[in-house]
Regions:
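Hydrophobic residues in well-ordered beta-strands that form the structural core
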Residues: 15, 94, 119-121, 227, ...
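Predominantly a Rossmann-like dinucleotide-binding segment in NAD(P)-dependent oxidoreductases
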Residues: 125-202, 321
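N-terminal Rossmann-like dinucleotide-binding module
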Residues: 1-49
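C-terminal helix-rich "cap/oligomerization" subdomain common to oxidoreductases
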Residues: 1, 60, 68-70, 289-334
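Contiguous beta-strand/loop segments that form the cofactor/metal-binding neighborhood of enzyme cores
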Residues: 182, 188-254, 284-295, 331-334
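Active-site loop of classical SDR/Rossmann-like NAD(P)-dependent oxidoreductases
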Residues: 14, 273-285
């Protein structure tokens, strides 16, 4: 199969302005269709982004014309959408977070194992230039053994918004999903990827609706990490302290950017050269290759489930006031 024909599920501004163009540009990828519950909305969006087909549901997708779906839907719809697509043999890329519970992540993984189709999670900061460079430096042990780190992924929400006020309604997506599921999952995924798995967490602060969260993470390696994710401030920092130096970034996350990374050793600081990149282009090129069977997906389903497990542990810790272990999700996929 020379190119994976993707259907974009969702018609948000983010889906149409960022993901659709990236699907069209990515190597080994083509944008074949748009899916929305409103068929006329799907048709209008398809015309806007240059897709030939429009469908009102995943079940309506013509399997002769589409190989996989990219789910850019509300968090609460991720599980049902992924399982429906996998049951039809469609490859799935699901936006982060993978789901709102580990239990549903496990159901998604089971569906993928049964179908044989790819299930991957859109943890796009895997391809952020500062993270790519930091990973290479850490793999070479340039700063020695890591013993502590801190990371922030936050933004200042608009005044009057649910995010800014930090008051969750009684039901719906916003009641279940807050800053940790929004930007915090990027930080959790980055720590898991760069420094190894999180073993134990202690929630220092989680406000109502999870609008302002701070947690201490103890890694399996013994390193300690302070993580913050808020809707009350702009935060974009990463610091990794090792026995032989420090890596620092004042811009590690973004969409189309070069970012910043520097290394401090023996009292001298050197900036690491970075090239501007669109994280979605790189992500969708890689995952199209993975769907074609040319490689394993870097942002695997299991990786997505592990990140949700860390968030669940933070929530348990916030409720109990005590440290909480991170439970490994079931399933072998990824």
């Amino acid at each position: 199969m020379s190119s994976i024909r993707w259907a974009l599920v969702g018609t948000s501004d983010f889906a149409l302005e960022w993901i659709a163009p990236a699907l069209a540009r990515a190597k080994g990828s083509s944008l074949a269709a748009v899916v929305s519950r409103d068929r006329s909305r799907a048709a209008a969006a398809a015309a806007q982004v240059g897709a030939a087909e429009a469908y009102a549901s995943i079940e309506a997708i013509d399997r002769d014309l589409v190989d996989g779906v990219v789910l850019v839907t509300p968090n609460s719809a991720h599980g049902a959408g992924a399982i429906a697509a996998l049951q039809r043999g469609l490859h799935v890329i699901v936006e982060k977070p993978m789901s709102h519970t580990v239990a549903e992540c496990e159901q998604m993984i089971a569906a993928a194992e049964t179908s044989g189709a790819m299930l991957a999670v859109a943890h796009c900061m895997e391809w952020a230039p500062p993270i790519v460079a930091a990973r290479e430096l850490l793999e070479r042990s340039v700063i020695g053994r890591v013993h502590r780190a801190r990371i922030g992924a936050s933004f200042l929400a608009e005044p009057g918004s649910l995010r800014r006020d930090g008051v969750a309604p009684a039901s719906g997506d916003a009641a279940r999903f807050g800053a940790l599921f929004d930007m915090g999952v990027h930080a959790i995924d980055t720590i898991n990827r760069l420094l190894g798995p999180v073993a134990i967490v202690r929630s220092v602060r989680t406000d109502t609706g999870d609008a302002d969260a701070v947690a201490e993470l103890q890694l399996a390696s013994g390193a300690a990490v302070e993580l913050s994710s808020r809707w009350s401030a702009d935060e974009n920092f990463l610091e990794i302290v090792g026995t032989n130096g420090v890596l620092r970034s004042r811009e590690w996350w973004g969409r189309e950017f070069a970012g910043h990374l520097e290394i401090e050793q023996s009292g001298a600081t050197e900036q690491v050269p970075l090239r501007r990149a669109n994280v979605y282009d790189a992500q969708l090129s890689h995952l199209s290759d993975a769907a074609s069977g040319r490689c394993a997906p870097a942002t695997s389903a299991r990786r997505g489930a592990v990140n949700v497990a860390v968030i669940e542990a933070v929530v348990r810790s916030a409720r109990s006031g005590e440290s909480a272990p991170v439970s490994a999700p079931r399933g072998r996929l990824g």
